[in-house]
Design a protein with these regions (language model features):
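Short, high-confidence coil segments that cap the C-terminus of an alpha-helix
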Residues: 49, 183-184
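Short, solvent-exposed loop/turn segments at secondary-structure boundaries
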Residues: 23-25, 64-65, 198-202, 278-279
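Short, motif-level signal for alpha-helix interfacial/capping segments enriched in acidic residues
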Residues: 32-36, 200-216
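N-terminal active-site segment of His-dependent metallophosphoesterases
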Residues: 1-67, 167
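Active-site neighborhood of phospho(di)ester-bond hydrolases with catalytic His/Asp-centered motifs
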Residues: 11-13, 52-57, 80-86, 122, ...
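Second-shell loop/turn segments in exported
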Residues: 27, 56-59, 158-162, 196
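Extended active-site neighborhood of metal-dependent phosphoesterases/phosphodiesterases
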Residues: 63-182, 207-217, 232-267, 278
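Solvent-exposed loop/turn segments at secondary-structure junctions
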Residues: 15-18, 58-61, 86-90, 125-128, ...
């Protein structure tokens, strides 16, 4: 096994901050996430990392929740990539179109290269009943898709999941093809899990599984959303679901990911599992 990684980066999933009372039934402690983020940044700032990515659900609800959580991120010395989850759209309807900009994203879906690896951020909220106001064509299309999934008896036919549209899928397909032509390995990141089958999975996620298998260069898909975490392998792709930071009163969870030519090493902190994933 090679001893030096191609690059290292940090992972945080589902801080889901809000100035709200805990939800004891689900073991979620919304206010405590600021202190957990600060603790995580204290550790991550001491590491040599290319960047830190947060896999969605920075907030639980309310536009004003973004202020304290984004202020906490100013304490992170590394480059930060944020993406929305379903809860980040639990804001007033007139604010829905501002969420990506509030998170400082260049676009709802985008890609970048670090250390010879292509990183791709997808937006599984695009087709959802919460990301566009009622009465809009995008909301109506999402409602129709959810109704079709309910009629099929799909286990992920939930209002708190979402999917991607044809334009985004075509962009993803083209991005993977360009990376393959350039000889780049790819890591795709999104909020919603794709595999193994689970009630939290992206609507129509099977299309992405097939695409990744055809492409053959997607070494990993990283996500949050399912707070208990999960792990699977399909084709040559590892599917890693990181645990939710908002869960439990005091225990934290975050990770450092190391990419090697022959493996992925995940160094888990707190409740997050450490893993060695051979490529």
């Amino acid at each position: 096994m090679t001893s030096s990684p191609l690059l290292r980066f940090g992972i945080i999933a589902d801080p889901q901050y809000a100035d709200a009372e805990p939800w004891a039934l689900l073991d979620r402690y919304y206010r405590n996430s600021i202190a957990k983020l600060e603790e995580a940044f204290g550790v991550l700032n001491g590491e040599d990392l290319s960047f830190v990515v947060t896999l969605g659900d920075l907030i639980d609800k309310d536009w004003q929740s973004f202020d304290p959580v984004l202020a906490a991120y100013k304490g992170l010395r590394h480059e930060s990539f944020l993406m929305p989850g379903n809860h980040d759209f639990s804001v007033a309807p007139e604010r829905l179109g501002e969420v990506h900009a509030r998170l400082g994203m260049p676009a709802a879906w985008h890609d970048f290269s670090r250390g010879g690896i292509r990183f791709v951020i997808i937006d599984g909220n695009e087709m959802s009943v919460f990301s566009a106001p009622e009465g809009t064509p995008r909301h109506a299309a999402a409602r129709a898709r959810l109704d079709a999934l309910l009629a099929e008896g799909a286990i992920n036919a939930k209002e708190w999941n979402g999917g991607i549209g044809d334009e985004q899928f075509a962009w993803l397909e083209a991005t993977l093809a360009r990376a393959k032509a350039a000889g780049e390995k790819v890591v795709v990141m999104g909020h919603y899990p794709l595999y193994p089958e689970n009630e939290h999975n992206l609507w129509g996620g099977e299309r992405l599984l097939d695409l990744f298998e055809r492409s053959g260069n997607v070494i990993a898909y990283l996500n949050g959303h399912n707070h208990v975490g999960n792990l699977g392998r399909h084709g040559s792709t590892w599917y890693v679901n990181f645990k939710g930071m908002v869960d439990t009163e005091k225990q934290n969870t975050f990770a450092v990911v190391e990419l090697y030519p022959d493996r992925i090493e995940i160094i888990g902190y707190g409740r997050e599992d450490s893993r060695t994933l051979p490529l």
